[in-house]
């Protein structure tokens, strides 16, 4: 794909000269920020939206608990609850994640310090960050509000997400992961549908990435539920890298394409129920497992087999063949893209650069897809959105 010429970024200091959430010398910070942003390959629309967000952010100042008014709950997970809030001094609508942690003040201060790196994460593919602070036993992380919610919520309403839409999602996730790796030397560590946020302007952004090692350690006990997206090498406790994020992306894409978490794989009967036609050659070859006595009969999606215990699931990811897309329903390019993400050996798995030039990504990039229109009609949103009163279009 031809490289876009960087467009100059125009950022104006806040009228009162106030710093960005408690940092000093706003003018110097803005100059450094302007330089970094000009290195990004932004189109005109992305540039204007990022400018609008950063200009508004300058007016926010230091964040305090008393300055927020709760509007509604957006979701819960990863040891925290996320609320849609109004920041009264600026009038901005934000998403505020509250994480309750019983920790010593020194650890708490280290987490807040480590989270400050998020101020430097400015990309069209990363959720905007307003600031973090501690109050009454809880760490607050204040972010841009994305009115379409997360892709796991969208999936519940859509049933399945079309391949063309997932093409645009794949591009955004690859670009977001590439930005984090190249500009900040960090990996995400928790790629899954609930950490991919969307809005009615058609933007797709990553959130909840592992910028604070201390926060990850402090929340280690709450990460059990996310292990189902972890790569085999990570589950085995060996060294892992951004290749692990690529596995998680591949698994997430299969889940969103078929409409349920893909382990264990759907059998022929379930595939027929899912797609309304006989899908040959992709049925699960695993025989039905006997149900462990006393275990509840809940299930993933339409799967009539007994649910897996967490240890069975992790064992399956490590020792059984990886999931794949049913061949009769999806394009060869999409199938191959997912297969390259889900190679069990991380050294053989495709890397970000290889994926960016894959035929599926090239095709998806060239396709005209009204992502915003699809999202709004699927979840019942008005279009276009103004997630904050300052959103530039």
UniProtKB/Swiss-Prot annotation:
Pfam families: Pkinase. It is a peripheral membrane protein. Residues 270-307 are annotated as: RAF1-binding. ATP binds at residues 74-82, 97. SUPFAM superfamilies: Protein kinase-like (PK-like). Transmembrane segments: none annotated. It comes from the Eukaryota. The keyword Nucleus applies. Residues 68-361 form the Protein kinase domain. One of its GO terms (biological process) is regulation of stress-activated MAPK cascade. One of its GO terms (cellular component) is late endosome. Belongs to the protein kinase superfamily. STE Ser/Thr protein kinase family. MAP kinase kinase subfamily. Found in a complex with at least BRAF, HRAS, MAP2K1, MAPK3/ERK1 and RGS14. Forms a heterodimer with MAP2K2/MEK2. Forms heterodimers with KSR2 which further dimerize to form tetramers. Interacts with KSR1 or KSR2 and BRAF; the interaction with KSR1 or KSR2 mediates KSR1-BRAF or KSR2-BRAF dimerization. Interacts with ARBB2, LAMTOR3, MAPK1/ERK2 and RAF1. Interacts with MAPK1/ERK2. Interacts with MORG1. Interacts with PPARG. Interacts with SGK1. Interacts with BIRC6/bruce. Interacts with KAT7; the interaction promotes KAT7 phosphorylation. This is Dual specificity mitogen-activated protein kinase kinase 1. It comes from Oryctolagus cuniculus. The lineage of its organism: Eukaryota, Metazoa, Chordata, Craniata, Vertebrata.
